[in-house]
Amino acid sequence: MTIAEWRQRLNNREISSLELVNEQFARIKDVDNKLHAFLKLEEDSARENAKRIDEARLSGKELPPLAGIPFAIKDNLCTKGVKTTCSSKMLESFVPPYESTVTQRLWEAGAILLGKTNLDEFAMGSSTETSAFGATSNPWDLSRVPGGSSGGSAAAVASGLCLAALGSDTGGSIRQPASFCGVVGLKPTYGRVSRWGLVAFASSLDQVGPFTTSVEDAAEVLQVIAGKDPLDSTCLDKPVPNFSEYFSDSIKGLRIGLIKECFEQEGISLEVKESVLKAANQLQSLGAELIDVSCPRFNDGIATYYVIAPSEASANLARYDGVKYGYRQHGEENLSAMTSLSRAKGFGSEVQRRILIGTYALSAGYFDAYYKKAQKVRTLISRDFANSFEKVDLLLTPTSPSTAFKAGSHDNDPLAMYLSDLLTIPVNLAGLPAISVPCGFDKEGLPIGLQLIGDVLGEQRLLQVAHHYEQAANVMGNCPKGDLIPA
């Protein structure tokens, strides 16, 4: 069911907000011991807020659009008075004194916080295995990863533990887990949504977006969280349009570009490629025109990203030293030793690896050879996209080269892990909006994701085409429920 359908049930008093919240917590208790999607539940406050909304509804008060709708929030978004750990020992006890802009907008719209979801430590990972508090499993197959870094949010939505969730996307961290878990994941244009209160990984790449079970719901959540924020200087001062305005309009005549560099990649699974091309043909049958386009530097995205993102991370994470807050190693003789050991024990191996890479790339003697060069390539990648959008309205690729891989299978091969974001990273480098929509299954019954990429601030068109595909392909609601999670 969509958020609109749940809202109708609530307004018709077929179910109360409290009953809906209680149903969600009952389901979480039934299955999350197997999934580990949540790090922390907010049961008391959720029930109190649900009762308050029920009372307002009974009194006939006009309610905001998400009144009574249960949400989960990735645990790198600050929630005032609620622990925000980034799945790191470094922030294990951190309780923010302020609310992130996106969560504040959700609560003002009536949404209810069920809890905080698991992620790769400081959002650095593609499998939700680097969490200091244990890995999350994929609800379609518990032996596989849910993707990352927002794997907890994706798994929670896919298994019906919440109606929607927020995640963050730095190089594919919403879209790749959405693909692996068979849900919708939307990364807005950089600056469309405020980053205030999002614990920074790579500030020029991070963006907040929703996980939902339908494109319609993704549009509705974006409607609430988008818009100018004086607390975030990178947030665009642009009008927020009606993101579902074009849903009823035909897509006949729209030009959709197939990026040939993506489909020529040797590392892409044949089943993934076939499923995505079938989805492209479905869009063609709806009247869209398919055009082959070239983004010559698309495949340089991985190398570029793994210079820029770690460089920004090394600067952003320098503040965690055990002095003012964060994990502190006691018993050391001096400040330098305490800081060094606090960081060594507070950060996991993947975070340490990226800090080292970033520090090296920014160091004197290597800045020009690595960081400066990567920024130049980033500009060229953005230019390739801009050239493509002179010929087409949207771009189409697989979301990920493969379906969900086995947990632990990439432990000793960081490069293989990094390559799982091969098709999503260039979008972040260019600051473009993109969405992952389920488009089929492989022979093992694992979901495959279709990625649609829009031009800057092109979310309306992006969501329109994704919605038309979703309706025509009848993929909405193909999510695992209790029967797909072994007892």
Swiss-Prot record:
User: What family does the Swiss-Prot or TrEMBL record give for this protein?
Assistant: Belongs to the amidase family. GatA subfamily.
Which keywords belong to this entry? Answer: ATP-binding, Ligase, Nucleotide-binding, Protein biosynthesis
Where, by residue number, is the active site? 74, 149, 173
Q: What Enzyme Commission number does this protein have?
A: 6.3.5.7
Give the matching InterPro entries. Answer: Amidase (IPR000120), Amidase_CS (IPR020556), Amidase_dom (IPR023631), AS_sf (IPR036928), GatA (IPR004412)
Could you tell me one molecular function GO term of this UniProt entry?
Answer: ATP binding
Biological processes, Gene Ontology terms: translation
Which major enzyme category is it? ligase
Which protein, by its recorded name, is this? Glutamyl-tRNA(Gln) amidotransferase subunit A
User: Which PANTHER family does the UniProt entry name for this protein?
Assistant: GLUTAMYL-TRNA(GLN) AMIDOTRANSFERASE SUBUNIT A, TRANSAMIDASE
Q: Name one Pfam family in it.
A: Amidase
Subunit and interaction comment: Heterotrimer of A, B and C subunits.
Q: Tell me the PROSITE patterns matching this sequence.
A: AMIDASES
This enzyme catalyses:
L-glutamyl-tRNA(Gln) + L-glutamine + ATP + H2O = L-glutaminyl-tRNA(Gln) + L-glutamate + ADP + phosphate + H(+)
Instruction: Tell me a GO cellular component.
Output: glutamyl-tRNA(Gln) amidotransferase complex
State what this protein does: Allows the formation of correctly charged Gln-tRNA(Gln) through the transamidation of misacylated Glu-tRNA(Gln) in organisms which lack glutaminyl-tRNA synthetase. The reaction takes place in the presence of glutamine and ATP through an activated gamma-phospho-Glu-tRNA(Gln).
